[in-house]
Amino acid sequence: MKQLTPRQAEVLALIRSAVQQTGMPPTRAEIASELGFKSANAAEEHLKALARKGVIRMMPGTSRGIQLLTDEPEEDEGLPLIGRVAAGEPILAQQHIETHYQIDGSLFHPRADFLLRVHGMSMKNIGILDGDLLAVHKTTQANNGQVVVARVGDDEVTVKRFERKGHIVQLLPENEELQPIVVDLTQENLSIEGLAVGVIRNGNWL
């Protein structure tokens, strides 16, 4: 199987997640909206590339005509472990993957798509410690109170609790020594990379 680009891997992860949660693949428009493409045509081009690489089959005549043929390459090896993510780069870029863990993502709810190595103690009060592996479900949507993997502008990703009121978002640490990150959505871009769905420490789920 040919190696996927980071964007193709994101599209494939989204398809797998949609099938897992709803029993059906997403439409082209849904893929474009979820991943920030300018049009459904851009999503179509990525789907054609995935079909050429043998991981999906496209069925004409239906907006949800996508059939998964094989597991995502990373799943054959386990969940990818993402180390430190450079500013402005896709979180699933190949250069960020340190290794793979033989963990079934469906054991988490919602399904885990990757693991992220935690740096720092900003979430220590809820048991997320420096060096832990955070199981993450890839999505661009978050509700108030959820722990998210987020990126402000082109900065590195951060793990914080999400709170939004109007156009103001606070990314709240669980550490009384640290201050929230306040984002005015009219002035800055905020990207949600995923939701925290579990913590692994020393090989054990917490």
Curated annotation (Swiss-Prot):
The active site is at S122, K160. Its EC number is 3.4.21.88. GO terms for molecular function: DNA binding; serine-type endopeptidase activity. The keyword Metal-binding does not apply. The record marks A87, G88 as: Cleavage. Gene3D superfamilies: Umud Fragment, subunit A, Winged helix-like DNA-binding domain superfamily/Winged helix DNA-binding domain. InterPro entries: LexA, LexA-like, LexA/Signal_pep-like_sf, LexA_DNA-bd_dom, LexA_repressor, Peptidase_S24_LexA, Peptidase_S24_S26A/B/C, WH-like_DNA-bd_sf. Keywords: Autocatalytic cleavage, DNA damage, DNA repair, DNA replication, DNA-binding, Hydrolase, Repressor, SOS response, Transcription, Transcription regulation. SUPFAM superfamilies: LexA/Signal peptidase, Winged helix' DNA-binding domain. GO terms for biological process: DNA repair; DNA replication; negative regulation of DNA-templated transcription; proteolysis; SOS response. It holds the Pfam family Peptidase_S24. It is an enzyme of class 3 (hydrolase). It catalyses: Hydrolysis of Ala-|-Gly bond in repressor LexA. Residues 28-48 bind DNA. The keyword Nuclease does not apply. Belongs to the peptidase S24 family. Homodimer. Represses a number of genes involved in the response to DNA damage (SOS response), including recA and lexA. In the presence of single-stranded DNA, RecA interacts with LexA causing an autocatalytic cleavage which disrupts the DNA-binding part of LexA, leading to derepression of the SOS regulon and eventually DNA repair. HAMAP family: LexA (MF_00015). This is LexA repressor.
